[in-house]
């Protein structure tokens, strides 16, 4: 919950070098003081599908945490008779090669067709909502390195994170600057960037 860390977000913001300084202290600082909890899901067609499958009654659910886990859950569904084949056929678990991941399509139109099986043997369909696209933007600094699955040294040893410098329009104080800062505070308890140039619209 953002409201539980908004004071920490404010404190961390004071360590960031903002140009102009007034944007960091004023516009962004005031936004952080009044930060509300962030609704992670959106009812849209584009974006990252929430990896949650539920039975029709809503009494059982599975939260899938990786492609490997989804692959294995699909295999269980095939064995239970809810699916006839694995759409990720040929995918090699543990192989992080780009060519291997090219076999996996996690777009909404694909994953919405995946039916999983609950612990009690009932069919489960995916939650229809998506993750807010701002979450994608805010997690970019480490997601681009496939962290935490690969390249841990780049993030854990501060080689590629936090960023030395970012720049965007002043409107991003409530967009990209905010989501970078919020996610970094929640996940790492540190800033996502050291220096910011905020220009006009």
Identify the role of each PLM range.
Residues 1-201:
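Structured secondary-structure scaffolds
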């Amino acid at each position: 919950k953002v409201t539980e860390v908004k004071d920490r977000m404010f404190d961390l913001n004071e360590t960031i070098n903002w140009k102009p300084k007034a944007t960091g202290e004023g516009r962004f600082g005031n936004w952080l003081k009044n930060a509300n909890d962030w609704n992670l899901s959106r009812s849209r067609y584009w974006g990252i599908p929430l990896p949650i499958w539920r039975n029709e009654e809503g009494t059982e659910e599975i939260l899938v945490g990786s492609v490997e886990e989804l692959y294995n859950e699909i295999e269980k569904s095939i064995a239970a008779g809810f699916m006839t084949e694995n759409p990720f056929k040929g995918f090699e678990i543990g192989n992080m090669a780009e060519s291997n991941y090219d076999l996996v399509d996690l777009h909404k139109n694909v994953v919405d067709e995946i039916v999983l099986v609950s612990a009690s043997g009932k069919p489960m369909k995916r939650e229809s909502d998506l993750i807010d696209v701002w979450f994608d933007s805010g997690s970019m600094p480490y997601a681009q390195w496939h962290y935490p699955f690969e390249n841990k040294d780049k993030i854990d040893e501060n080689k590629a994170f936090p960023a030395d410098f970012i720049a965007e329009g002043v409107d991003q104080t409530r967009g990209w600057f905010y989501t970078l800062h919020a996610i970094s505070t929640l996940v790492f308890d540190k800033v996502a960037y050291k220096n910011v140039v905020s220009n006009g619209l």
